Design a protein with these regions (language model features):
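Bacterial N-terminal signal peptides that target proteins for export
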Residues: 1-11
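Low-complexity, acidic/polar, glycine-enriched regions of mature
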Residues: 154, 192-194
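An ectodomain-focused feature that recognizes extracytoplasmic/extracellular
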Residues: 25-133
C-alpha cells in the first residue's frame, strides 16, 4: 500500500511539473529575430574599430556574429550600448561597452563624451577609460524598431567616434587606444511600473 501511494504521489508530482512547464512555455515571450541570431532584426548591425596598444586589432563584425544589448546608463545620464563579437570555441569573446553621456532616448546628437570599456571575456582582462573624457561620439542617430505600443521600446542606434586617450587595465600596466569606432547596435528601454 505504501508503495502504491508513493508511486501515485510521484506520478502526480511529475504530471504537475509537466503541466507547469507547458504553461510556462506558452506564456514565455517569443524570441525576436535580433535575439535569436545576431544584433538587429533588420540584419544591418555592425561594429568596426581600430585598436592599438597592448593588442593591435582591426575589428570588423557583421550583424549575425554579434550580440547587442543596451539601455540607459545606471545613473540615467545617457545611454549604454554593449556589443560582443563572435564567441570562440573555448568561450572567449571580445566585448565593447560604450557609455554615451547626455544622450536621450530617440535623440540624434553629436560631440558626446563617451566612456569605453573593452572586455576580453574568458580571459579576465578588462580595459577601461575610467571616465568619459578620452572618447567622443561624433554623430549618433536612433531609429525606433519593433512594436510601437507597450512599455518596452527598442531603438537601432548608430554611432561614429574616436578616442584620444587609452583605455587601461585596472592596475594600469597595459593600455589600448581605440582610434576609431563605428557601430550600429540596439538599445531596449522599459517604462518602470507606477509607484517605483
Amino acid at each position: 500500500m505504501a508503495r502504491k501511494t508513493l508511486a501515485r504521489g510521484g506520478l502526480l508530482a511529475l504530471l504537475t511539473a509537466s503541466v507547469a512547464a507547458c504553461a510556462a512555455a506558452d506564456t514565455a515571450p517569443p524570441q525576436t529575430a535580433a535575439t535569436a541570431k545576431g544584433c538587429l532584426a533588420s540584419g544591418d548591425g555592425y561594429l568596426r574599430a581600430r585598436v592599438r596598444g597592448a593588442l593591435d586589432l582591426d575589428v570588423n563584425w557583421r550583424n549575425d556574429e554579434m550580440e547587442c544589448t543596451g539601455g540607459s546608463r545606471p545613473d540615467g545620464s545617457g545611454l549604454r550600448v554593449s556589443i560582443a563579437g563572435p564567441a570562440q570555441s573555448d568561450g572567449r569573446r571580445l566585448r565593447f561597452v560604450f557609455g554615451i553621456e547626455g544622450t536621450a532616448e530617440g535623440a540624434a546628437v553629436g560631440q558626446r563624451p563617451t566612456n569605453l570599456t573593452v572586455i576580453f571575456e574568458g580571459e579576465r582582462r578588462l580595459f577601461a577609460t575610467q571616465g568619459d573624457d578620452k572618447c567622443t561620439v561624433d554623430t549618433l542617430t536612433q531609429q525606433r524598431t519593433g512594436p510601437l505600443g507597450g512599455p518596452k521600446r527598442s531603438w537601432r542606434i548608430e554611432a561614429h567616434g574616436f578616442c584620444v586617450g587609452p583605455a587601461a587595465t585596472l592596475t594600469g600596466d597595459a593600455r589600448l587606444l581605440v582610434t576609431r569606432f563605428d557601430f550600429a547596435g540596439r538599445i531596449d528601454l522599459t517604462d518602470e511600473a507606477p509607484g517605483k
